[in-house]
């Protein structure tokens, strides 16, 4: 095992519950939290704030290397906080405009490499919970516990539907299911860091499991590895 602070990686497709599980686990253990999926949005948002063109690879690389961000695990039932340069940007980075910018910066190899190193810098004592799609395969391949959390596309669409309806949004379950299936295909077929479980990952299907049941399974794996 690495002599560095321990890392638990939680990878999986959109809607699998990995963000919720990661946040609750980080809060329970008192460990740091990394929401890797938010980093590209944060970089695009920060670049716009500093007047940096989203095609300027060198300046984006420099911004990525020094991204001042903190993820604060939320209480059960609440959203995590994302703090950028001392400001809560949890909601503003979720806009379509920021999302489009995130896609642009994610296509730049030098930026991806800089963010890879920035993600690894989150690894500090007492430990880190890293949530994403390639945490166990690319970012922290030596993590002592890797979890790959999934659920059926239908269940993930249902969860998203209930989440959006709860916010008062008018959404179609069938269209959400189509979106999730399309995203799954993009994520698993992409050339760079495709979505797949690490060879040594614990695979959990949460379709029929509650969040607490998923957490209990992870606690058992942590105990087996003397991490708690």
Curated annotation (Swiss-Prot):
Signal sequence segment: none
Catalytic activity, reaction form: CMP + ATP = CDP + ADP; dCMP + ATP = dCDP + ADP
Coiled-coil zones: none
Keyword NAD carried by entry: no
Keywords: ATP-binding, Cytoplasm, Kinase, Nucleotide-binding, Transferase
Similarity comment: Belongs to the cytidylate kinase family. Type 1 subfamily.
Protein name as annotated: Cytidylate kinase
Species in which this protein is naturally found: Pseudomonas entomophila (strain L48)
């Amino acid at each position: 095992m690495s002599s560095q602070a321990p890392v638990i990686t939680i990878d999986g497709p959109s809607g699998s519950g990995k963000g919720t599980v990661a946040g609750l686990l980080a809060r329970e253990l008192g460990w740091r939290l990394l929401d890797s999926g938010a980093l590209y949005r944060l970089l695009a948002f920060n670049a716009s704030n500093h007047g940096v063109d989203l095609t300027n690879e060198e300046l984006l690389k420099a911004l990525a290397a020094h991204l001042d961000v903190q993820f604060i695990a939320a209480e059960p039932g609440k959203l995590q906080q994302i703090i950028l340069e001392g400001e809560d940007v949890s909601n503003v980075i979720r806009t379509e405009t920021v999302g489009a910018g995130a896609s642009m910066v994610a296509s730049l190899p030098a930026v991806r490499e800089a963010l890879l190193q920035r993600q690894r810098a989150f690894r500090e004592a007492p430990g880190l919970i890293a949530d994403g799609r390639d945490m166990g395969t690319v970012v922290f391949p030596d993590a002592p516990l890797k979890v790959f959390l999934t659920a059926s596309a239908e269940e993930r669409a249902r969860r998203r539907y209930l989440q959006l309806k709860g916010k008062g949004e008018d959404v179609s379950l069938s269209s959400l299911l189509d979106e999730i299936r399309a995203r799954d295909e993009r994520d698993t077929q992409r050339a760079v860091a495709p979505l797949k479980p690490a060879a040594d990952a614990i695979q959990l299907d949460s379709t029929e499991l509650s969040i607490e049941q998923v957490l209990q399974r992870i606690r058992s794996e942590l105990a087996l590895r003397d991490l708690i």
